[in-house]
């Protein structure tokens, strides 16, 4: 290759440009290869993360929001299975009580429940949360509660209440809950002289990774969480607290309205298992600090997009637009049929 460059031109400037292009190409190829190797190691070679470092089986507590169903319920169940006591936070108290009884019976850990409708953003609810965890050695917080649009919708047609709820639930409540719980985590870690670490997981989305037309408010709310979580990670890591944004594509859940799992769409159990296995590892989010895309199919999708068209490209935006316009069209037709019936 060097001989070829020398033979192309005797002009020093041209040679310098060609050598520079060659070095840049080698650098890009090397970083791509190393990132791909790291992704594979994270997924299939490195052992699962040992939650003893977060206080599992040592009397420590995890707080999980949106804990009564789906992904949140799986976080609660799987963290309890690892030996963490759990504080279950969600809107419906009856579901929380039933889950708490199931967890205590099956995993022999302690539980607390708190009925908390985050869409109301009531100060009394945050005070109740603070009171619930006041005497608990909390080491883990899972910010799982979230809301999307009922169906894809142009921003200019978005219902004001839906817009407000998305921002309140995904952003305001997440930040305020973290302000309540994170100081307890920092205190617990400090009291043990950092022999136990803290962990804050916040649910992100491909909607935040890729600007998504027809889900503009939801997409923006999740993109906000990316920057906020990364900034918080920088602040709390020196204090012994790991902060990660968890990126996912679709998972079978009430919010996604998908009932049947597939290779690219896991059920909550498989998804949460991948999250907890890979805490502290980027997996598909190789280009991002304090971020993980842990489920294998989502990881390769994330890695592929970043290393091909790019997350902010016109191509990615147009593909997303077409997909969500189609989803909206089908949803409206289905609603029209149901109305006739």
From Swiss-Prot:
Residues at which NADP(+) binds: 63, 117, 144, 218, 222, 251, 253
Cellular compartments annotated: Endoplasmic reticulum membrane
InterPro entries: 3_ketoreductase_fungal, NAD(P)-bd_dom_sf, Sc_DH/Rdtase_CS, SDR_fam
Top-level division of the source organism's lineage: Eukaryota
Gene3D superfamilies recorded: NAD(P)-binding Rossmann-like Domain (3.40.50.720)
Coiled-coil stretches noted in the UniProt entry, renumbered to this chain: none
Catalytic reaction(s) noted: a very-long-chain (3R)-3-hydroxyacyl-CoA + NADP(+) = a very-long-chain 3-oxoacyl-CoA + NADPH + H(+)
Residues spanning the membrane: 17-37
Biological or metabolic pathway of the protein: Lipid metabolism; fatty acid biosynthesis
EC supergroup of this enzyme: oxidoreductase
GO process annotations (BP): fatty acid elongation; sphingolipid biosynthetic process; very long-chain fatty acid biosynthetic process
Keywords: Endoplasmic reticulum, Fatty acid biosynthesis, Fatty acid metabolism, Lipid biosynthesis, Lipid metabolism, Membrane, NADP, Oxidoreductase, Transmembrane, Transmembrane helix
Catalytic residue positions: 218 (proton donor), 222 (lowers pka of active site tyr)
Membrane disposition: Single-pass membrane protein
E.C. code: 1.1.1.330
Record SUPFAM superfamilies: NAD(P)-binding Rossmann-fold domains
Predominant subcellular localization, coarse grouping: endoplasmic reticulum
GO molecular function annotation: ketoreductase activity; very-long-chain 3-oxoacyl-CoA reductase activity
Annotated Pfam families: adh_short (PF00106)
HAMAP family: 3_ketoreductase
Family: Belongs to the short-chain dehydrogenases/reductases (SDR) family.
Record function comment: Component of the microsomal membrane bound fatty acid elongation system, which produces the 26-carbon very long-chain fatty acids (VLCFA) from palmitate. Catalyzes the reduction of the 3-ketoacyl-CoA intermediate that is formed in each cycle of fatty acid elongation. VLCFAs serve as precursors for ceramide and sphingolipids.
Protein name, entry field: Very-long-chain 3-oxoacyl-CoA reductase
